[in-house]
Amino acid sequence: MNLLRGRTFFVLILLILFFGFKSPAFLSVSSIITIVKHVALYGIIGVGMTYVIITGGIDLSVGAIVGLVGMIAGGLIVEGLPVKALGVTLYFDVPAIILITLLLGGFLGWINGTIITKFNVAPFIATLGMMNIARGLAMLRTNGATYSNIAGEQVLGNTGFNRLGSSAGGIPVVVFLFFAIAAVAMLILKFTP
């Protein structure tokens, strides 16, 4: 196994032992669960970035696009989508909000890919531009503020995001989501040319 041959694995073990001796709370169950939860979030993004790196590219805009679609998801939960022409505000349920944000993120990624492939712009430059556009749009969306309460309201049917942060059997749901995404990505890499 390559992991055991590399120095990085042993450095990781040394760091865990060092911080475990420095603070016994570091090796507590709650601390380890918190670390695993955060690693899983970055792992999900890392799975997607793996495909970009395999093709020899780079995508600097990922974090900004995640921030933008997160800001839009928060806005859809807290404020809904005002339709001024009809004088109504539309509220979406969580699956619809997830679908909207995935489609928007995919669309922005498609724009990156189109600029890179059709116009022969270097991936670094194209994604740097998209990073600044996504950051700017996120700032414009809320004037630099954040959404602090995205629990939604039962009456509007937009609750459920808090389930993504919950646990199943003591393990955060996002960890299961990471392993599912990683497994699908692995199968795609293994069985497609």
Where are these regions (language model features)?
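Alpha-helical transmembrane segments within multi-pass membrane transporters and channels
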Residues: 81-130
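Membrane-embedded alpha-helical core segments of multi-pass
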Residues: 44-48, 69, 81, 104-111, ...
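Transmembrane helix-bundle core of multi-pass membrane transporters
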Residues: 123-193
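Alpha-helical transmembrane segments of multi-pass integral membrane proteins
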Residues: 3-4, 37-38, 97-104, 173
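A cytosolic-side transmembrane-helix exit/cap motif
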Residues: 52-54, 82-92, 141-152
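Hydrophobic core segments of alpha-helical transmembrane domains in multi-pass membrane transport
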Residues: 9-21, 49-50, 101-105, 134-136, ...
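Single transmembrane alpha-helix segments in multi-pass membrane proteins
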Residues: 6, 17-22, 27-81, 114-124
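N-terminal membrane topogenic signal
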Residues: 1-9
